[in-house]
C-alpha cells in the first residue's frame, strides 16, 4: 500500500465517544467548517448549513428530543463542540428570488442532492478534525426528530437537520472497527453477492452485533418522520 499521510488519517479514523473537557478553539472550528465547504457539491448550490450549538439549554432540549436516556447521551453531553449539519435550500431559494429567478428544484432532487451535499461536507469535516488531532462522532438519530430539532434551532422551511457532529479532544483511543472485506464491497461491471465464507468471516468479526435501533423504526414512527419532513418542505 502507498504510504501517504492523508491516507493514514483516513484509514485510522474511528469514532470517539469520550472527550476531555478542554475547549476547542474557534479558529479550529471555523477551519473544520471551511473544509466541509470544499467538499463536492451539486451544481455549486452548497445545499447545507452548519449550526454551532453552544447554548447548553438548546443542547439539553436536542438530547431530549432525539436520544433521550440512551447511552449516546453521555458522550453528547461531554463533547465541547456540536455542529448540526443541515440540508439547506432556503438560502438558495432566497438567492434565486433576489435575482428574479424561479425556484425550479424538483422535490426528489431537492431531497437527494441536499442529503448528498450535507453528507459529503460532513465527512470532510470529520477528516479535518482528525487532521487537527481532534476526535469526533456522528449522532445519526437527529433525523428521527426533524420537527423537534427544527423548532429548537429555529430552522425555516426548506432546511432539514441531517446529522449532529460532536467534536473534542479525545480522552480515549479506541481500536478501529472491522469492515467488510474488500472483495465483498468492490464489484466489477456487475453486482455479486458475497459468498457464505465472507458472510461467516464478517459475522465472526462483528461478534454480537445486531441491526441498531434507527433501522428498526415502528411504522407509526416512520410515518411521523415523513410528515415532519414534509412540514419542513421536503415532500418525500
Question: Residue locations for each model-derived region?
Answer:
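Acidic, surface-exposed loops and disordered segments
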Residues: 1-236
Amino acid at each position: 500500500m502507498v504510504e501517504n499521510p492523508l491516507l493514514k488519517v483516513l484509514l485510522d479514523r474511528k469514532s470517539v465517544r469520550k472527550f476531555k473537557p478542554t475547549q476547542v478553539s474557534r479558529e479550529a472550528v471555523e477551519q473544520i467548517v471551511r473544509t466541509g465547504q470544499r467538499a463536492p457539491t451539486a451544481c455549486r448550490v452548497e445545499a447545507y448549513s452548519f449550526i454551532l450549538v453552544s447554548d447548553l439549554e438548546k443542547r439539553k432540549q436536542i438530547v431530549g428530543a432525539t436520544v433521550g436516556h440512551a447511552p449516546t447521551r453521555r458522550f453528547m453531553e461531554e463533547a465541547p463542540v456540536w455542529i448540526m449539519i443541515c440540508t439547506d435550500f432556503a438560502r438558495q431559494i432566497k438567492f434565486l428570488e433576489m435575482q428574479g429567478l424561479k425556484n425550479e428544484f424538483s422535490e426528489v432532487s431537492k431531497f437527494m442532492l441536499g442529503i448528498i451535499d450535507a453528507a459529503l461536507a460532513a465527512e470532510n469535516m470529520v477528516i479535518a478534525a482528525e487532521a487537527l488531532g481532534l476526535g469526533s462522532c456522528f449522532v445519526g438519530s437527529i433525523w428521527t426528530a426533524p420537527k423537534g430539532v427544527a423548532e429548537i434551532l429555529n430552522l425555516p422551511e426548506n432546511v432539514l437537520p441531517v446529522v449532529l457532529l460532536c467534536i473534542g479532544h479525545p480522552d480515549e483511543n479506541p481500536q478501529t472497527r472491522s469492515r467488510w472485506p474488500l472483495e465483498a464491497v468492490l464489484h466489477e461491471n456487475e453486482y455479486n453477492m458475497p459468498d457464505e465464507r465472507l458472510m461467516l468471516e464478517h459475522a465472526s468479526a462483528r461478534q454480537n452485533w445486531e441491526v441498531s435501533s434507527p433501522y428498526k423504526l415502528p411504522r407509526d414512527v416512520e410515518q411521523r418522520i415523513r410528515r415532519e419532513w414534509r412540514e419542513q418542505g421536503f415532500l418525500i
